[in-house]
Amino acid sequence: MKVLLIEDSKFQRLANERALVKAGYSVIHAADGEQGLRSACEQLPDLVLLDMMLPKVSGLDVLRALKGDPLVKHIPVIVLSGLGQANEAKLLKEGAAAFFVKSEKSLENNSSILIQAVEAVLSNAKARV
């Protein structure tokens, strides 16, 4: 399974990649929204992990673009946010499959919860096909 990780924080990107690879996933990186959109269309991942605070194109605009593109709109997107759950309902309405609050305080716990979220979303996506 291929996961596109769109995250501008090198620290978060490396931590999430390590957890995903350990869980058996192949990871594609994108450090900004523009690169993330391009990678999604070129690589057609099974899942997108999308940070909300990105340079060039915001996470919300990336989510809207992904869900508006017939080529990739079927790909589930898990939104990653360090700002808490204030916009969770709005992002789920925009098409996010799940919302994940990231924390730098408990990285190990973060990683295991993220993997659980990834597995749940991918399992739901398979069930719908």
Task: Locate predicted features.
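Alpha4 helix (beta4-alpha4-beta5 surface) of REC/receiver domains from two-component response regulators
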Residues: D61, L83-E119
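Acidic, metal-coordinating helix/loop segments flanking the phosphotransfer/catalytic sites
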Residues: H29-L47
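The feature encodes the CheY-like receiver
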Residues: P55, K73
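Acidic catalytic/metal-coordinating carboxylates
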Residues: D32-Q35, S58-R64
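Conserved acidic carboxylate
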Residues: E7
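Active-site residues of response regulator receiver
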Residues: D51, S81
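Two-component/phosphorelay signaling modules centered on CheY-like receiver
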Residues: K10-I28
